[in-house]
Amino acid sequence: MKLEGGKEVAKIIKAIKDSGVPVMGHLGLLPQTAEKYSVQAKKSEDAVNLIQDAKILEESGAFSIVLEMVTSDVTEIITKSVKVPTIGIGSGINCDGQVLVVHDMLGIFEKIKPKFAKRYLNLSEEIRNAVNSYVNDVKEKRFPDKEHTFSMEKDELEKLEKKIV
């Protein structure tokens, strides 16, 4: 399970962990509640709060902490300050691991491209071409063909035809 938030979710993390369910913390940009997507911990006081929150999440029993859109400098400090692995998304190279949303990595959305997401493929174009091919095949009666269709055995079809005549 992954919970977004800092000290305000610490007791919840502890309770869930104590019941036997592993919990991953999530700090920085909190996409489930964010009103706007912006880089986190650009100011020193915000950075101090985030570092404290990371330590609190670790103390509460989080097995790992996602750091989303946190400045690389603060990510490095947090990673050195906690013993649990940090996983970055848009937070630079200083985390113990990295994650990307597969839609961003594969270029599924043409117009949505977060600055921190490297596109390894442009699937939006391939998807558009595939859908256009499908539509054309349906219009031209090339799909579905025999390969993609189920049929009755010939003798059963003959029996059916006799029953409905």
Give the predicted meaning of each segment.
Residues M1-V165:
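Alpha/beta enzyme core
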